[in-house]
Amino acid sequence: MMNLWKGTVRRVGATLLACVLLLGLLPQLPRQAGAAYTDSYLQQMVDWGFMRGDISGNLRPDNPISRAEFVTVINRALGYEKLGGDPFQDVPDSAWYAEDVDIAYTEGYISGTSKTTFSPDSSITREEAAIILTRNLMLQPDTGENTSFTDSRELSEWSRGYIATAARYGLVNGYPDGSFRPKNQITRGEAAILVVKAVGTPVQTAGVHSLGSTWGNVTITS
């Protein structure tokens, strides 16, 4: 089981985001409905600068997202930048993801697969990804731990409350058959959907901004 640390979240927009969620403004989106649905979220991630394609420009929506890729996306989406050093021997300083792993470890929202390994190329499960993002949004786990997913019994004990919260706020949806498939590797496309729902409208530059009639979350990272 992957150890997940709650850590301290430093976000200027945390209070605003929490208020929006508590007011119930997060729209309930349809269950995952194929390539067109996923592609729109991937394009939004690219437009915001949270996700990039490979050297050929391919976004590979159906490929599992690695641990290194996932923390990189989270850091960009939430504006994390603080470096503090990490103990991982399998994260060379020359690796493209080295700084983001350091940031994620320093922020405290993810730990290694052991005291000295991070396993950057390993995949991450759907329940792990949902918990990481839910904790970063400062949302507390539901005490009832009830979800409407048909395979809720497959959820790990440590994830039930957080998944219930994520589902209640519309951060996660199931598949057309009503299942959540918590142990499945989360794909790049699914990760994009999760992050876009969480951050809503990002404000990444300093100054006065008009959000118009925006409904949902607003994340301030400038």
Regions found by a protein language model. Give the residues of each.
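Feature responds to low-complexity, polar/acidic, surface-exposed segments characteristic
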Residues: M2-Y41, V46-E99, T106-E127, L133-R160, ...
